[in-house]
Curated annotation (Swiss-Prot):
Keyword NAD applies: no
Top-level taxon of the source organism: Viruses
Described purpose of this protein according to its UniProt entry: Chaperone involved in tail fiber assembly.
First and last residue of the signal peptide: none
Full protein name: Probable tail fiber assembly protein
Keywords attached to this entry: Chaperone, Viral release from host cell, Viral tail assembly, Viral tail fiber assembly
Stored InterPro entries: Phage_T4_Gp38_tail_assem, TFA_Chaperone
Family per similarity comment: Belongs to the tfa family.
Gene: 22
Length: 167
């Protein structure tokens, strides 16, 4: 029994020591990590992940600059190369007419699919003679909405208003 307890305590000590060493190593790595930005790839690099495999045109940036850039990009903002090869945040360009048509076509398809999903159980209730007056009215509103969606010109969109309620 005593040997088992000693073995358990020894294992626990080894685990705690390994955990402490990992934390110290991680903290050292974080403090020693350098960040770089490459204009030729429009990408970021760190010594932790890329070692010395960093493009020749890369410029060193601070961790806070890297965090600001990463957190600032999004739907309307993007990272690009500025003066002296340093990264900057700029407004994303407006989509081309072709890209906008593609986006609108995808939206149109998604809205039609949503309408179809709402219509199906309402239509079942009507077909089976089980629909309430509200369900019948809702079915007609959603069917009209779906027809209007099918008629939307993806190059010049005016989206119809979605019906209230979707049982």
């Amino acid at each position: 029994m005593s040997r088992t307890l000693d073995l358990i305590l020894l294992c626990r000590l080894v685990q705690d020591t390994a955990h402490l060493l990992m934390r110290i190593t991680l903290q050292w790595d974080i403090n020693e990590m350098s960040y770089f930005y490459s204009a030729s790839t429009n990408g970021f690099y760190s010594t932790e992940f890329h070692g010395t495999n960093i493009p020749d045109d890369a410029v060193e940036i601070s961790e806070s600059e890297w965090e600001t850039l990463i957190n600032s990009q999004g739907v309307t903002k993007m990272i690009t190369c500025g003066e002296n090869g340093h990264p900057v945040i700029v407004d994303r360009p407006s989509p081309t007419p072709e890209r906008l048509a593609l986006i609108n076509d995808e939206k149109k398809s998604a809205l039609i699919a949503e309408a179809t999903n709402v219509i199906a159980p309402l239509q079942d209730a009507v077909d089976l003679g089980m629909a309430t007056d509200d369900e019948t009215k809702l079915l007609l509103a959603w069917e009209k909405y779906r027809v209007l969606l099918m008629r939307v010109d993806i190059k010049n969109t005016e989206w119809p208003k979605k019906p209230e309620g979707n049982k």
